[in-house]
Regions:
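Beta-propeller folds
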Residues: 1-251
Length: 251
């Protein structure tokens, strides 16, 4: 039993129904409906933003489902899911390759191993993307140190480049293992709030409907002059643009 001002953790994650934290060397998920807590995996934020934590799967950061029963992580450029209770792991995608992987959190100047996903409210579907950086130009940085310097390389498209980073939006259904690609051209690796698809540590501009049957998202032009609000039917992949806005300067 712990006092309110002496809790055994300094960080925690939460959503509308659960709170997740580490205590006693284990990860805990507490259901706020019945106030029951179960242990399973290390779920504390790894300090690089967002709601991801580190679980099994080779120590890769994971993102828990809203009901706390499953966690997804990246392995070899593909997205995997782990059962929190049993530890069983299964691949959700199989065709991811270097520079064309799933749920990739890599803007070049900023990157992490945490998957970029958004769970549906019913915990049965995942919105994510396959990020295409094949053929994109590279930037280099020499990391100086007392011993030999280390050369760091990352993808960095420059103004005027014809080959740039894009994302192909997909939805994965965990109930039957199917994946639906949204029927639209690839989106720019942008958001309405910054030059990265991740802003403030979370994947913004994407929202599920309460019944998990559709989702809304924003598409942003590379120059931040145009925005498109779109609705996707996740069973068919059909996408409808419901609002378009443009400005002479930038958003």
């Amino acid at each position: 039993i712990y006092e309110a001002y002496g809790l055994p953790f300094t960080r925690f994650e939460f959503d509308a129904n659960t709170i997740r934290f580490n205590a006693g060397g284990r990860g805990w998920v507490c259901n706020m409906q019945n106030y029951l807590c179960t242990s399973g995996g290390d779920v504390t934020d790894d300090g690089r933003g967002g709601r991801g934590g580190r679980g099994s799967g080779g120590g890769a950061p994971t993102v828990l489902s809203p009901d706390g029963t499953r966690a997804v992580f990246i392995r070899d450029d593909n997205l995997w899911v782990r059962d929190v209770a049993t530890g069983d792991e299964q691949p959700l995608t199989r065709d991811g390759i270097k520079d064309y992987g799933y749920a990739t959190d890599n803007a070049g100047w900023r990157k992490s191993d945490r998957p970029v996903v958004l769970w549906s409210p019913d915990s049965n579907k995942i919105a994510t993307f396959q990020q295409d950086q094949r053929g994109v130009g590279e930037m280099y940085l020499a990391d100086t140190r007392p011993s030999h310097p280390r050369l760091e390389t990352w993808k960095y498209p420059l103004p005027g480049d014809s080959v740039i980073t894009v994302v192909e939006r997909v939805v994965i259904n965990l109930e039957d293992g199917t994946m639906v690609r949204l029927r639209m051209p690839p989106d720019q690796h942008r958001s309405s709030r910054c030059d990265d698809i991740i802003c403030g540590g979370s994947w913004g501009d994407v929202q599920w409907s309460p019944d998990s049957s559709s989702m809304a998202f924003l598409s942003t032009s590379r120059d931040h002059k145009q925005e498109w609000l779109r609705i996707a039917d996740i069973s068919s992949g059909e996408v409808h643009t419901v609002l378009e806005e443009s400005v002479p300067t930038f958003f």
